[in-house]
Structures are given as structure tokens and as C-alpha cells.
A protein has these predicted regions:
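Generic detector of contiguous secondary-structure segments
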Residues: 2-6, 28-29, 34-36, 141-152, ...
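Hydrophobic aliphatic residue packing
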Residues: 13, 102, 128-132, 159, ...
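Domain-level recognition of soluble alpha/beta enzyme cores
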Residues: 1-102
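Short, surface-exposed linear patches
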Residues: 39-42, 66-71, 125-128, 133, ...
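Alpha/beta-hydrolase active-site loop
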Residues: 114, 118-124, 145-186
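Short, solvent-exposed loop/turn and secondary-structure capping segments
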Residues: 30, 57-61, 113-118, 140-144
Length: 186
């Protein structure tokens, strides 16, 4: 038995992975007092959303994850897979759109897949959930902590703005699906 709030909601869950670039960001690792270096900051986003599934499609997904720290020989990167309860690239359920947005920001070090038990559950309850792989802050690419200090909140704001743009873009799967004015941050 699970506590009441941990049970699944009424919606089936879809999941997609997308890549976005935050242009002209300060590269704090390679900048110095004489020169500010800019770069286009890559971010991988995992997006869970209420979905419509055809009869033969199940909420089954396999996530590829990495644990460890690429720069620490005592904690080598170890790849593994785990199953989740979502359907990859499923059609979105538009019956109750727009859905509130939740942005998930992992710790240092971490990954966008750390809280799938929560992100899938929230999507089943009628939320669009976007989890960010923060560059320089994941198991796979952890770098100096000053990058995390500078970029974490900037990533969160950039992602909020990107999701809002996608909600107005008729070519996006998020078109009219998400209400970015009703957003929570975890």
C-alpha cells in the first residue's frame, strides 16, 4: 500500500527528450579577469506530460543513466538502465489543457532522470514536468562548482522561457499543452 498522494493520477504519461541551447552564456570556467568567454550552453531536457495511448501501447520506458563522477577514479562512471512508467514520444492528452508546469532542477552532481518516480507521478496527475540536465553539473560532466553557482538559476529561467515559447509554437508538441504562467520549481 502507498500513501494517498503517491498513487498515480488519472492520466497516462508520455515522455520526450529534447536538446536546447542557451546562447551567449558566460563560460565561467574558461573566463578570467582579462577576458570573458561566452558559449552556447547545451541543456538536455526530459519532459513528462499527460498522454493518450492507443490500446496496444503501454506505459513502459527504459531510461539510460550514469552514476559516478567522470573526474574521480574512486567513483568511476557506471552506466545502467532502469524501467519507468511512461510511453516514449506518446501523443499528448489535450482534454484538460493547458496543464501547469513543473521544472525539476537536480543537485550537484545529478541528472534529469534522478526523480522519475516523482516526475512520472506528477504528469499522471495533470502536470507537464520538465527536468533539466544542467551542463557541468551532471554525473557525466561535473566540473568546477562555480559553474553550477552561476548557471543553475539561469538554466531554470531559460527553460521556463523556452517551454513558454514552445507552448505558443504550433509545430511543437507542447503547443497549447502547458501553462507557463502557472509554474513550480523543484
Amino acid at each position: 500500500d502507498a500513501p494517498v498522494l503517491s498513487s498515480r493520477g488519472k492520466y497516462k504519461v508520455g515522455v520526450k527528450t529534447i536538446q536546447v541551447l542557451n546562447p551567449k552564456q558566460i563560460d565561467i570556467i574558461n573566463s578570467n579577469k582579462d577576458q570573458t568567454v561566452l558559449y552556447d550552453r547545451p541543456l538536455t531536457l526530459e519532459i513528462w506530460y499527460p498522454a493518450l495511448l492507443e490500446n496496444d501501447i503501454k506505459e513502459e520506458v527504459v531510461y539510460n543513466q550514469m552514476m559516478g563522477n567522470f573526474s574521480d577514479p574512486k567513483r568511476p562512471l557506471i552506466p545502467f538502465k532502469f524501467k519507468g512508467r511512461a510511453s516514449r514520444n506518446a501523443k499528448s492528452n489535450r482534454s484538460d489543457e493547458p496543464y501547469p508546469l513543473i521544472i525539476v532542477s537536480h543537485g550537484y552532481t545529478g541528472s534529469r532522470l534522478m526523480f522519475t518516480y516523482l516526475t512520472e507521478n506528477l504528469a499522471s496527475k495533470g502536470y507537464v514536468v520538465v527536468s533539466i540536465d544542467h551542463s557541468d553539473s551532471t554525473f557525466n560532466d561535473a566540473n568546477k562548482f562555480n559553474s553550477t553557482l552561476l548557471n543553475r538559476s539561469l538554466d531554470d529561467l531559460f527553460v521556463l522561457n523556452q517551454i513558454e515559447k514552445m507552448s505558443f509554437d504550433s509545430s511543437s508538441f507542447l503547443y497549447q499543452l502547458v501553462d507557463a504562467n502557472n509554474t513550480a520549481l523543484i
